Amino acid sequence: MALKDLFERDVQELEREGILFTTLEKLVAWGRSNSLWPATFGLACCAIEMMASTDARNDLARFGSEVFRASPRQADVMIVAGRLSKKMAPVMRRVWEQMPDPKWVISMGACASSGGMFNNYAIVQNVDSVVPVDVYVPGCPPRPEALIYAVMQLQKKVRGQAYNERGERLPPVAAWKRTRG
């Protein structure tokens, strides 16, 4: 019997006894995915739905997003909720740069994702032209359940790591789930 087979048999026996085996990277990714702290960056009507996601009915805290952070230095996730004006874009970029690595961005609503329903010269047409976006949440405004689903999608992405082996960011995910009857 090969050494590898003996080791696998021993691991299986220890797992039956309740001992957990994992890599350090998986453990850190699990911890990060279950403690995502969002930065407050509500810009318009979507911010109201973002706040509603923390109420008793929706309870975003059960996914580890306990408290919205006012300081970017304490946040992991920036939720861009609403339209982004061209004057506000450099400020948002600066806030994103102040967030510690690893950091993620959720683009919430039609205005943040594509500029909104109207082509307005003062509005940035895509938030991903200012900061890299990891998850898009469609809707005008999206319901709190859609934001919670986006956080769940981001958790999956964080567990699988948001970067590949060369250090490049993985492509964004569209968080779409039917939230109404």
Curated annotation (Swiss-Prot):
Textual note on the cofactor: Binds 1 [4Fe-4S] cluster per subunit. This [4Fe-4S] cluster is referred to as N2.
A Pfam short name: Oxidored_q6
A single MF term (Gene Ontology): NADH dehydrogenase (ubiquinone) activity
Alphabetical GO biological process terms: aerobic respiration; electron transport coupled proton transport
Cofactors demanded by this protein: [4Fe-4S] cluster
PROSITE patterns, alphabetized: COMPLEX1_20K
This protein's UniProt keywords: 4Fe-4S, Cell membrane, Iron, Iron-sulfur, Membrane, Metal-binding, NAD, Quinone, Translocase
Enzyme Commission number(s): 7.1.1.-
Origin superkingdom: Bacteria
An annotated GO cellular component: plasma membrane
Residues that, per the record, bind [4Fe-4S] cluster: 45-46, 111, 140
Record's bilayer topology term: Peripheral membrane protein
InterPro entries on file: NADH_UbQ_OxRdtase-like_20kDa, NADH_UQ_OxRdtase_20Kd_su
Chemical reaction(s) catalysed: a quinone + NADH + 5 H(+)(in) = a quinol + NAD(+) + 4 H(+)(out)
Keyword Membrane in record: yes
Location within or outside the cell: Cell membrane
Function comment: NDH-1 shuttles electrons from NADH, via FMN and iron-sulfur (Fe-S) centers, to quinones in the respiratory chain. The immediate electron acceptor for the enzyme in this species is menaquinone. Couples the redox reaction to proton translocation (for every two electrons transferred, four hydrogen ions are translocated across the cytoplasmic membrane), and thus conserves the redox energy in a proton gradient required for the synthesis of ATP.
Record family assignment: Belongs to the complex I 20 kDa subunit family.
Matching HAMAP family: NDH1_NuoB
Subunit record text: NDH-1 is composed of 15 different subunits, Nqo1 to Nqo15. The complex has a L-shaped structure, with the hydrophobic arm (subunits Nqo7, Nqo8 and Nqo10 to Nqo14) embedded in the membrane and the hydrophilic peripheral arm (subunits Nqo1 to Nqo6, Nqo9 and Nqo15) protruding into the bacterial cytoplasm. The hydrophilic domain contains all the redox centers. This subunit interacts extensively with Nqo4.
Protein name: NADH-quinone oxidoreductase subunit 6
Organism whose genome encodes this protein: Thermus thermophilus (strain ATCC 27634 / DSM 579 / HB8)
